[in-house]
Regions:
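Short, solvent-exposed polar/charged micro-motifs at secondary-structure junctions
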Residues: 14-19, 60-64, 159-166
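Ordered, soluble secondary-structure elements with a strong preference for glycine-centered loop motifs
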Residues: 23-27, 63-65, 126-130
Length: 180
């Protein structure tokens, strides 16, 4: 039967094939490569080793709570948010220790589009380790050193190599980087 394509129906989306994480995975890899390019350009370091540190479980919980609060209540009032967070047993220690971290996370969240924020709310958990591991070959290719040593650690890893304590600067979707 010969039919014109213009008379055919549009294809339908198969939601089971769609991953909420895919856009964040790709953006995480792109941002990591871009950040490393900036660091090497400014410092004029030729990287031999690159260490990437992902945020702790507590920081991820804090991020999720901030994201929910900002999206549901449409407010990012730092004082109001801090009062709530210091009473949350799950995250109060990190909040009291580092109010600047809370401020930076709020800025991170507000810098993203509403669509990105809404998608991230729907994601139960986002593991930065998997896309970062997948991005190592792209990073090596970009730098032009296929033998470049790249290690990825969680901030919580007790055996991580972190001579400058860079891991403490990691935030969800914003891994910390150390280059030798």
């Amino acid at each position: 039967k010969n039919r014109f394509v213009s008379f055919e129906s549009w294809p339908e989306v198969n939601d089971s094939k769609f991953s909420l994480n895919s856009e964040d995975n790709e953006k995480l890899i792109q941002d990591m490569i871009f950040d490393i390019q900036k660091i090497t350009k400014v410092t004029k370091i030729v990287p031999q080793k690159i260490m990437i540190y992902t945020a702790s479980t507590t920081k991820n919980k804090l991020y999720k709570k901030l994201l929910d609060r900002i999206q549901k209540e449409s407010t990012a009032n730092f004082g109001v948010i801090m009062k709530e967070l210091v009473n949350d047993d799950e995250i109060k220690d990190v909040v009291k220790r580092s109010p600047d971290l809370v401020r930076k996370m709020i800025e991170d969240i507000l810098s993203e589009s509403v669509d990105v924020r809404e998608r991230r709310i729907k994601i139960d958990s986002f593991s930065e380790m998997i896309p970062l591991q997948d991005g190592i070959s792209l990073l090596r290719n970009d730098i032009g050193n296929y033998k470049l040593e790249v290690r990825i650690y969680s901030e919580e890893d007790s055996d991580k190599y972190d001579p400058k304590q860079k891991s403490r600067f990691s935030r969800p979707y914003k891994p910390a980087i150390y280059i030798e």
